[in-house]
């Protein structure tokens, strides 16, 4: 689809590019059971990173009225290190941290090409 991405998703993609420069964010958009969807059991560590990220978003950090998918925030990327700005609102700070921790998690998890674009119906019940 050519719909523009929500700004926050774009920011998350930029964070991933910061910690995993060798891969496209697209590699993470449809991986395992949780990177791009969300059901069943995670297939590996990278998929687990996405499950944790989903749970982080769903919790909204406990901030009332916080909508993580559309919330933008301020952060910096310096030589692969992500820092969320102290100027962020409570909601933005929470979402920034969800994304920051996931991007760091992605960098530390092995990428298994066999888990890209898997059959969700058979593998993610």
Curated annotation (Swiss-Prot):
Q: Where is this gene product found?
A: Secreted
List the catalysed reactions: a 1,2-diacyl-sn-glycero-3-phosphocholine + H2O = a 1-acyl-sn-glycero-3-phosphocholine + a fatty acid + H(+)
* Cofactor binding summary note: Binds 1 Ca(2+) ion.
Tell me, in one coarse class, where this protein mainly resides: secreted
Keywords assigned by UniProt? Answer: Calcium, Disulfide bond, Hydrolase, Lipid degradation, Lipid metabolism, Metal-binding, Secreted, Signal, Zinc
SUPFAM superfamilies given for it? Phospholipase A2, PLA2
Chain positions recorded as Zn(2+) binding sites: 30
Catalytic residues at 53, 99
Question: Which amino acid positions bind Ca(2+), per UniProt?
Answer: 34, 36, 54
- Short name of any one Pfam family annotated for the protein: Phospholip_A2_1
First-tier enzyme category under EC: hydrolase
Q: GO cellular component terms?
A: extracellular region
- Removed propeptide positions: 2-7
The EC number(s) attached to this protein equal: 3.1.1.4
Signal peptide feature range: 1
Spell out the PROSITE patterns in the cross-references.
PA2_ASP (PS00119), PA2_HIS (PS00118)
UniProt GO MF annotations? calcium ion binding; calcium-dependent phospholipase A2 activity; phospholipid binding
- Could you mention a single GO BP entry for this protein? phospholipid metabolic process
Disulphide-bridged cysteine pairs = 18-77, 33-124, 35-50, 49-105, 56-98, 66-91, 84-96
The prosthetic group or cofactor this protein requires is:
Ca(2+)
Source domain of life: Eukaryota
Hey, what tissues is this thing expressed in?
Expressed by the venom gland.
The UniProt function text for this chain reads: PLA2 catalyzes the calcium-dependent hydrolysis of the 2-acyl groups in 3-sn-phosphoglycerides.
Subunit relationships: Heterodimer formed between isoform 5 and isoform 6 in presence of zinc ion and monomer in absence of zinc ion.
Name this protein carries in UniProt: Acidic phospholipase A2 6
